[in-house]
């Protein structure tokens, strides 16, 4: 039986916000039966289930529907919020073309592969190993367009750099120094470095969704594993990290649960529902 945090009133929780990859979605890109059951119990308990992911909407939507989620889905690190059933975009905060061009040129000069997202489609320079790896992870098609800077003439929702973890750590430091707050920069997974409009985050998107649902963010429990989940956990009344989470979450999380492989979030959700009056 999972133990809930001391001081948490289960009856006060009105929503849970959940990252996907490595939080409730395993490395095999599947939900465990326990996770599907636990999330499915939330609606009957009067708790809204909110998916908050760095994934594209086209990639996240099937997962949200599999879980039976009806609340708006937070995608692209918070740059896009959309209705999982109608597909309507409720919020979109893309990077303008000049900023996107500057990012593309900086990443290209560093010699890394990158993905560019326009109109919820994935575009790459060429279909190389990195492009195929990402497209497989997202379960979507990548479109090769050649020179990305020359091709891009519209705002882009975000840009993702693909590479080895240590190399991306160094690039992240370089890009943060170069852009100096002019872009959101964070890792979603060890091999994915994400860049978006400054001010974009899962936390700001959670506040937007809560306002639409008439929920106080203080009445939300948020779950995450990555450095890109810091703002999500900060925005919620209670932030919960999985056991193998990025070290950046340690000072933010008010509670920890076992890893996705051990159904940590599912256990917490079951305990939460079972403890409500």
Q: Where do the protein language model's features map onto the residues?
A:
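Conserved ATPase-coupling elements of RecA-like P-loop NTPase cores
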Residues: 27-31
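Active-site T/S-Asp motif of two-component receiver
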Residues: 18
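Mg2+-dependent phosphoryl-transfer enzymes with acidic/Ser/Thr/Gly-rich catalytic loops
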Residues: 3-15, 32, 194-277
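Short, structured coil segments at secondary-structure junctions
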Residues: 67-69, 76-77, 179-181, 235-236, ...
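Hydrophobic packing residues within well-ordered alpha-helices of enzyme cores
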Residues: 35, 60-64, 171, 175, ...
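Active-site phosphate-binding/coordination module
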Residues: 33-131
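Conserved acidic, metal-coordinating active-site core of Asp-based
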Residues: 106, 110-223, 227-231, 235
